[in-house]
Amino acid sequence: MGYDTDMKVLVVDDFATMRRIVKNILTQLGFKNIVEADDGATAVDLLKNEKVDLIISDWNMPKMTGLELLQHVRADAAMADVPFVMVTAEAQQDNIILAVKAKVSQYIVKPFTAETLGEKLDKVFS
């Protein structure tokens, strides 16, 4: 495990059930400080007042997509280096390329397992 479980993690997804699943997996992995937002725009507002150490976001959301959120984070000097993991049903190669060009840290296609998320986080923080 190459990550600090005391870090603050932001989980962004428009489906409460998916946020709960990701939070449960993070809790199983030992994370204790998890905040959430139900879309990219809400996440941007939250990030104005809170520093996070990791962002895990869905792609398809109302108001602001996960890709737009990623681009916003990377354009902000204060957040540009925050690891960003995209967890999405978007498995098309074109979307993966867009995310990589926007400097996503890791890309996970739904459905996924707790083991997959843990492995991706190990890669992000190794």
What does each model-found stretch correspond to?
Residues 16-35:
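Two-component/phosphorelay signaling modules centered on CheY-like receiver
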Residues 23, 68, 91-106:
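Alpha4 helix (beta4-alpha4-beta5 surface) of REC/receiver domains from two-component response regulators
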Residues 36-54:
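Acidic, metal-coordinating helix/loop segments flanking the phosphotransfer/catalytic sites
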Residues 39-42, 65-71:
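Acidic catalytic/metal-coordinating carboxylates
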Residues 56-58:
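Active-site T/S-Asp motif of two-component receiver
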Residues 61:
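Receiver (REC) domain active-site loop signature in two-component systems and cognate sites
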Residues 112-121:
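C-terminal output helix
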